[in-house]
């Protein structure tokens, strides 16, 4: 007798219960500064982090981990509703944060606003879906980004 048995173990503590669905959707998102200038520090970093949390709250997703990596790359671990597309999440994060940073951080005016295209962020981004097994590993990786930068200096 040759029987294939598939056992799936689900940690119910990681599940989110919606009105019509149960889900656990997590994404590792990375994007960077368009001109690779090291500007995401001090006041700019504070404004950026606050703004990203505000965007998440407004649009209904959660930022579980956040760090600014070397070369001014932003690393986020995001949990989202099934009806939210990653494309929309990235559009909101990049567009609204750039607008807010240019508004609140005049020091960015000289480094980015005078360029002909006036973009803060690179047009590209990286996204990876994260299963429950990888979630802790990705969270550690994101948390380690600042430590790696400090060790390089």
PLM feature segments, named:
Residues 1-153:
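Basic nucleic-acid-binding interfaces
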């Amino acid at each position: 007798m040759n029987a294939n048995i598939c056992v799936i173990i689900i940690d119910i503590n990681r599940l989110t219960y919606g009105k019509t669905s149960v889900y656990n959707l997590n994404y590792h998102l990375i994007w960077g500064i368009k001109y690779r200038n090291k500007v995401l520090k001090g006041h700019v970093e504070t404004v950026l982090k606050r703004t990203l949390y505000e965007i998440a709250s407004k649009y209904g997703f959660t930022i579980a981990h956040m760090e600014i990596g070397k070369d001014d790359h932003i690393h986020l671990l995001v949990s989202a509703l099934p009806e939210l597309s990653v494309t929309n999440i990235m559009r909101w994060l990049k567009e609204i944060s750039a607008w807010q940073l240019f508004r609140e951080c005049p020091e960015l005016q000289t480094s980015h606003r005078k360029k002909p295209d006036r973009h803060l962020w690179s047009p590209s981004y990286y996204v990876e879906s994260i299963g429950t097994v990888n979630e802790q590993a990705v969270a550690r990786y994101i948390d380690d980004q600042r430590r790696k930068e400090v060790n390089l200096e």
